[in-house]
Design a protein with these regions (language model features):
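N-terminal presequence-like segments and the immediate start of the first folded domain
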Residues: 1-76, 80, 84-96, 104-151
Length: 151
């Protein structure tokens, strides 16, 4: 497959319209994306279920599989935001970095599996251009590691 859109079609993904980032009447004082030179920085997106912010903690009310799907769904919204910013997803030269914030129970250790939902989608859609650096922030580190550092 040659284009991002052919890959999206093969994955049966239709990009959504990007709703304004308003939650419960709160209107943020930031933009959904900012372009500077050849880089585009995206604001965070909340996971949603049935059009409303997804609520709960991984390892309590939400399973790893549900979290992985939620991360994938957020990545689809990210693609829609990039589409809005660029007009054409084929213009994306590289996904450089992704940060995933995971709300989890204290004993949940599979945050990396949740984040993989988004990472896998970006690689499926962009191929090698979708391979990226990633930071996953949680209350507890994967593999119970006591220290972690991002570069």
């Amino acid at each position: 497959m040659n284009t991002v859109y052919e890959r999206l079609n093969a994955l049966q993904i239709k990009l959504p319209e990007i709703p304004p980032p308003v939650v419960d009447g709160y209107v943020p004082l930031f933009e959904p994306f900012v372009r500077t030179g050849n880089l585009i920085y995206l604001s965070g997106r909340l996971a949603k279920k049935d059009g409303k912010p997804y609520s709960g903690k991984l390892g309590q009310q939400i399973t790893t599989a549900e979290g992985r799907q939620a991360a994938r769904d957020v990545a689809i919204e990210v693609l829609a935001t990039l589409q809005t910013a660029l007009g054409d997803l084929n213009k994306v030269k590289r996904i450089v970095k992704m940060t995933v914030l995971v709300n989890s129970a204290p004993d949940f250790t599979e945050s990396h599996e949740v984040a993989n939902g988004a990472s896998k989608l970006l690689c499926e859609v962009f191929g090698e251009r979708g391979a990226h650096a990633r930071t996953t922030l949680v209350g507890r580190r994967s593999h119970s590691a006591p220290v972690w550092k991002s570069r």
